[in-house]
Structures are given as structure tokens and as C-alpha cells.
């Protein structure tokens, strides 16, 4: 099977065996239906066991799957009347970030997201989903427009990180990201951000200062990649698997730490297995979050967002007196 991941090999091998038996029965007079039924039941149990007990590194692999749905895939399935806007009005148009105006269940919204490619040619065009400063400035332009016209903002996060090249630094990469963080904190409309793949460092956070931060079940959100963390901590990028477990970068871990608000269920095996069904899960989550946020006024939205990010990283400890009474 194309795009199989390392931990999926037992599932793939069993699927192939079932497929071979089915083909054999079609080409012969032998009835192997009983054996096929038993193998299919075994496959169901195997899939259930593997996909309900995924390790952090398994989720990293799923988040990086080449066929994983992108921002534009979800825009196609979730929104109507999408009109893409281009350019930052300073330098140019960065195709690593897409954004525009659309309708979600009839409600006018602004949609913004990082966009990866699905093949080499498109990845080069999209800079592998790593935005330049003009991408973040385009995103901010659309956010301010949404604020002016009272449209909720929905952001899709899917990037390894902001592009670290010389030209990007010369054009003010860090300033562009910092400006987004500052401006997003004060937006007077509901902001919902969803991590749909990899959420890497400040490049992800520049679309992540939201009233609600959601993650797909098999996405990741971290300050650095597992390979980068392993290289820094243990001088060996080969220990990325260990780093992934240690860093707590998966959706279940981050929900437990109160970094994110909600984990969106994924199709078994990953979102790439059924884009339409995955979009339906996201649709339901967005509907619920928007319903609650639209009840808040401008000041409540800003205060809620402020309180959310003020509390991140808070540590609670209980001190026990051990001295002389």
C-alpha cells in the first residue's frame, strides 16, 4: 500500500494476504470465504489494537504523512463561496499561506492557513509549507479586515515552522511573527485555530493566538521538531523517537496540560484515510465552538483570549512544611 508507515506494516501485510485470497477465489473453484472472514475479523482487531495505542512517534509519522489533508482540502469540504485573497501590500504574495473570505454554514468567516504541497513541484511552490514574512503579513491583513467587518476567523495550522532563510530574515521574519501575536491578542472577533498536521514553533504560533485552540487527534504542536530536540539535548537526532515521547507534543498530552481546548477525533489510521469524514468531524467541532463564542461581546472575547494565554505554563505546587514546629 502506498504511503504505509513503519508501525502499520502488520496491518498492511494482513490486508495484502486477504486481497490475495479474494483474488485466488475469483480465479478458482475453491471456497475460502470462511478463512477470509476469519482474517478480516483478525484485521479488525489488529487495527483496533494498533490505532488505539499509538505512541508519540507514531502520531508524528501520521502528522507528516504525504497524503495528509491540507488547508485547501478542508476549505473545499467545510466552506462555501471561498474567495482567496493575495498579497501583504508590502512585498508580495506568499503561497505557503492561503486565506480569504468564505461561508461556514451560511456564516461569513475569514479562513487562513498554512499550505503544504502534495508533490515536489507544489512543495517548491508552497515552500514546503514554511511561510515567509509576507505570508504572515498577508494573514494579519486578512485578520484586520475580518475584525473591521465583524467576521469570525478560522485558522488552520500546518507547518514545520517559519522559513529560516536569509531573505526571510532580511525582510523581518521575527518582527512579522511578533506583530501577529500582538495583534491577534486584541482582535474583537472570535478566533479559532486548528492544528491539522505539524504545528512547529513560532511559525505555528503566529496563527495560534485564538479563543479556542483545537488539534486533530494525530497532529503535533511543539517549539521544535523531535529531531531538533534530540540533536540539542543528546547530540543525536537519531533519538527523535525518545524526544517525541519526552516533549509531550501530541494532542492528548497537550489537552491534559491545558495547552489546547479540544481534541478532534480522527478517522482510524489518520485523516488521509477519509478526507470527507475527517472534514465532518472538524465541521461538528467548529459549529460547537462558534456557537459558544458568538455569544460573547468584544471585551469578553479579548479577555478570554488574554486569560487563556496568561495561564499557559502555570505550575501548581503544594508546599509541605518539614521544619521545626
Swiss-Prot record:
Q: Which residues form the signal peptide?
A: none
Domain CoA carboxyltransferase C-terminal, residue spans: 38-292
Q: Which UniProt keywords apply?
A: ATP-binding, Cytoplasm, Fatty acid biosynthesis, Fatty acid metabolism, Lipid biosynthesis, Lipid metabolism, Nucleotide-binding, Transferase
Enzyme Commission number, as recorded? 2.1.3.15
Q: Which GO terms describe its biological process?
A: fatty acid biosynthetic process; malonyl-CoA biosynthetic process
Kinase among keywords: no
Q: Does the keyword Nucleotide-binding apply?
A: yes
Q: Any idea where this protein resides? A: Cytoplasm
Segments forming a coiled coil: none
Q: What does this protein do?
A: Component of the acetyl coenzyme A carboxylase (ACC) complex. First, biotin carboxylase catalyzes the carboxylation of biotin on its carrier protein (BCCP) and then the CO(2) group is transferred by the carboxyltransferase to acetyl-CoA to form malonyl-CoA.
Q: How does it assemble?
A: Acetyl-CoA carboxylase is a heterohexamer composed of biotin carboxyl carrier protein (AccB), biotin carboxylase (AccC) and two subunits each of ACCase subunit alpha (AccA) and ACCase subunit beta (AccD).
Protein name as catalogued: Acetyl-coenzyme A carboxylase carboxyl transferase subunit alpha
Organism, per UniProt? Bacillus licheniformis (strain ATCC 14580 / DSM 13 / JCM 2505 / CCUG 7422 / NBRC 12200 / NCIMB 9375 / NCTC 10341 / NRRL NRS-1264 / Gibson 46)
Amino acid at each position: 500500500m502506498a504511503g504505509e508507515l513503519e508501525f502499520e506494516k502488520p496491518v498492511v501485510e494482513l490486508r495484502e494476504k486477504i486481497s490475495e485470497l479474494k483474488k485466488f477465489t475469483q480465479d478458482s473453484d475453491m471456497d475460502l470465504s470462511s478463512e477470509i472472514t476469519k482474517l478480516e475479523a483478525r484485521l479488525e482487531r489488529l487495527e483496533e489494537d494498533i490505532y488505539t495505542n499509538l505512541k508519540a512517534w507514531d502520531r508524528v509519522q501520521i502528522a507528516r504523512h504525504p497524503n495528509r489533508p491540507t488547508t485547501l482540502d478542508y476549505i473545499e469540504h467545510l466552506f462555501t463561496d471561498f474567495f482567496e485573497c493575495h498579497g501583504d501590500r508590502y512585498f508580495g504574495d506568499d503561497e505557503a499561506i492561503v486565506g480569504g473570505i468564505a461561508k461556514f454554514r451560511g456564516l461569513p468567516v475569514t479562513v487562513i492557513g498554512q499550505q503544504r504541497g502534495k508533490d515536489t513541484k507544489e512543495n517548491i511552490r508552497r515552500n514546503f509549507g514554511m511561510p515567509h514574512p509576507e505570508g504572515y503579513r498577508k494573514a494579519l491583513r486578512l485578520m484586520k479586515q475580518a475584525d473591521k467587518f465583524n467576521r469570525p476567523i478560522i485558522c488552520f495550522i500546518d507547518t514545520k515552522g517559519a522559513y529560516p532563510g536569509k531573505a526571510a530574515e532580511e525582510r523581518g521574519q521575527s518582527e512579522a511573527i511578533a506583530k501577529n501575536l500582538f495583534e491577534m491578542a486584541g482582535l474583537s472577533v472570535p478566533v479559532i485555530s486548528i492544528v491539522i498536521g505539524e504545528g512547529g514553533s513560532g511559525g505555528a504560533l503566529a496563527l495560534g493566538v485564538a479563543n479556542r485552540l483545537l488539534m486533530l487527534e494525530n497532529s503535533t504542536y511543539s517549539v521544535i521538531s523531535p529531531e531538533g530536540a534530540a540533536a540539542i539535548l543528546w547530540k543525536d537526532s537519531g533519538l527523535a523517537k525518545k524526544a517525541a515521547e519526552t516533549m509531550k507534543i501530541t494532542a492528548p498530552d497537550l489537552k491534559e496540560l491545558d495547552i489546547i481546548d479540544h481534541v478532534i477525533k480522527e478517522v482510524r489510521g489518520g485523516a488521509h484515510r477519509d478526507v470527507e469524514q475527517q472534514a465532518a468531524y472538524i465541521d461538528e467541532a467548529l459549529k460547537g465552538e462558534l456557537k459558544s463564542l458568538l455569544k460573547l461581546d468584544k471585551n469578553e472575547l479579548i479577555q478570554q483570549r488574554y486569560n487563556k494565554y496568561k495561564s499557559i505554563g502555570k505550575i501548581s505546587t503544594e508546599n509541605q512544611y518539614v521544619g521545626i514546629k
